[in-house]
Design a protein with these regions (language model features):
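Surface-exposed, charge/polar-rich loops and edge strands
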Residues: 2-62, 69-253
């Protein structure tokens, strides 16, 4: 139904109105989603910062811990059975691997340790040398998850030697199957070795994802697009009113 406002008439078509409402609703939903992601990233950053406030000593029986909890554990590395997670990048965008080393806990049980990033060699057939000295030591690091692929298509072949085994986004179960070990600590899927610890490589640990303000900026863009669409809808559907006695729909035929 046309609405007269002074010398102007607002007279949108039904289909145009419906389409505009749907698009604006979608844009607003995307904006809210980005704000939610910003809140989630803030919480993750706060958890990462708070993880170092207290250190937990872990063993095989330790229950699952919150992500980024700082831990310590006595034990020894198993240098002979390591995994290189492929397609990992450094902070400068260089291609390489994360070095995942099994750690035998004193008293029994195992946990995986991410000892850091190493660069890709001249070719993928040229595996990096990642041996670590044997012997007892005290492990210090943060609990975390293994890197996950954004999209995985279909089942994958099991991991097989020779070591070090190169794998793209392996799961904990896949690595456990490769090592033929069943006694795993439940504290975490992997421990990020502290930057100050020996026997590690490049370690620039931080909570993954964009900074919160990046998500806020994306939200502002979505809200701005919604506002722009609303303005276009109004402007394109307002016309000058016809003179008295003229056919008000003449300009729309």
């Amino acid at each position: 139904m046309p609405i007269r406002i002074g010398s102007r008439i607002f007279d949108p078509r039904l289909f145009t109105t419906f389409l505009t409402i749907v698009l604006i609703a979608a844009l607003l939903a995307l904006g809210r989603w980005q704000l939610q992601r910003a809140d989630a990233k803030r919480a993750l950053d706060e958890r990462f910062a708070a993880g170092a406030d207290a250190t937990r000593t872990i063993d095989r029986e330790t229950p699952p811990l919150l992500r980024y909890q700082h831990i310590e554990a006595p034990g020894a590395y198993d240098s002979a059975r390591q995994v290189l997670i492929d397609n990992m990048s450094s902070g400068q965008g260089r291609a390489g691997y994360f070095v995942i080393t099994p750690f035998a806990l004193r008293g029994g049980g195992w946990i995986l340790v991410n000892r850091g990033w190493v660069p890709l060699g001249a070719s993928r057939a040229d595996k990096p040398q990642v041996a670590v000295p044997q012997g007892p030591r005290e492990l210090h690091g943060r609990t975390d998850d293994l890197p996950r692929a954004g999209l995985q298509l279909g089942p994958r072949a099991p991991l097989t030697p020779p070591y070090p085994v190169v794998a793209s986004f392996p799961t904990h179960d896949e690595i456990a199957g490769l090592l033929h070990e069943r006694a795993w600590s439940r504290a975490a899927a992997v421990v990020l070795l502290d930057p100050g610890e020996p026997d590690g490589y490049l370690r620039q640990w931080q909570a993954p994802g964009f900074p919160p303000m990046r998500h806020v900026a994306y939200a502002v863009q979505w809200f701005g697009l919604a506002l722009t669409l609303a303005v276009i809808y109004v402007v394109t559907n307002v016309r000058r009113a016809a003179a008295d006695g003229a056919d008000p729909g003449a300009g729309r035929r």
